[in-house]
């Protein structure tokens, strides 16, 4: 690997360790020429997963985008970031294990809501109100009634 400081093509690995729950490897390297130290990350190249939106628009799946939506729904709620990251990882893993190249956004939304309902009901309702585009208070009340039924 080329040194980012001097462009020499010889480096040696000083330290390697798994990161991101074993999904990638962090390597600490040193240039054999100038002794500059730098960090690299290695991960498996994944086949793109395409999300088909309600309007038919296609975009690449983004775990970060899903996480941002979850963080917004859980704002000022007692939900740890780690829980939200785990939800995103589980959903992505489940989608990739299906072996399909395209998935509908509705399916992802339902998967998120199922998991969110189990950890925080207020966050679930917040997410559902945006995801399901509640038009009026009656739709909101119906969603709350469904949530109460599921609890029993």
UniProtKB/Swiss-Prot annotation:
Residues 49-139 form the ATP-cone domain. Its cofactor is Zn(2+). InterPro entries: ATP-cone_dom (IPR005144), NrdR-like_N (IPR055173), RNR_NrdR-like (IPR003796). Keywords: ATP-binding, DNA-binding, Metal-binding, Nucleotide-binding, Repressor, Transcription, Transcription regulation, Zinc, Zinc-finger. GO terms for biological process: negative regulation of DNA-templated transcription. GO terms for molecular function: ATP binding; DNA binding; zinc ion binding. Transmembrane segments: none annotated. The keyword DNA-binding applies. A zinc finger (unnamed) spans 3-34. The keyword Cell cycle does not apply. It comes from the Bacteria. It holds the Pfam family Zn_ribbon_NrdR. Binds 1 zinc ion. Negatively regulates transcription of bacterial ribonucleotide reductase nrd genes and operons by binding to NrdR-boxes. Belongs to the NrdR family. PANTHER family: TRANSCRIPTIONAL REPRESSOR NRDR. This is Transcriptional repressor NrdR. It comes from Bacillus licheniformis (strain ATCC 14580 / DSM 13 / JCM 2505 / CCUG 7422 / NBRC 12200 / NCIMB 9375 / NCTC 10341 / NRRL NRS-1264 / Gibson 46). The lineage of its organism: Bacteria, Bacillati, Bacillota, Bacilli, Bacillales.
């Amino acid at each position: 690997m080329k040194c980012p400081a001097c462009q020499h093509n010889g480096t040696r690995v000083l330290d390697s360790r798994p990161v991101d729950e074993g999904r990638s490897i962090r390597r600490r390297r040193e240039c054999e020429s100038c002794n500059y130290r730098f960090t690299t990350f290695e991960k498996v190249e994944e086949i793109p997963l395409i999300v088909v939106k309600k309007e038919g628009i296609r975009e690449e799946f983004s775990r970060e985008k899903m996480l941002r939506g979850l963080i917004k729904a859980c704002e000022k709620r007692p939900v740890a970031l780690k829980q939200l990251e785990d939800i995103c990882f589980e959903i992505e893993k489940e989608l990739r294990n299906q072996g399909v190249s395209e998935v509908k956004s509705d399916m992802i939304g339902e998967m998120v809501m199922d998991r969110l309902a189990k950890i925080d009901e207020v966050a679930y309702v917040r997410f559902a109100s945006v995801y399901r585009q509640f038009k009026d208070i009656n739709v909101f009340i119906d969603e709350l009634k469904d949530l109460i039924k599921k609890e029993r």
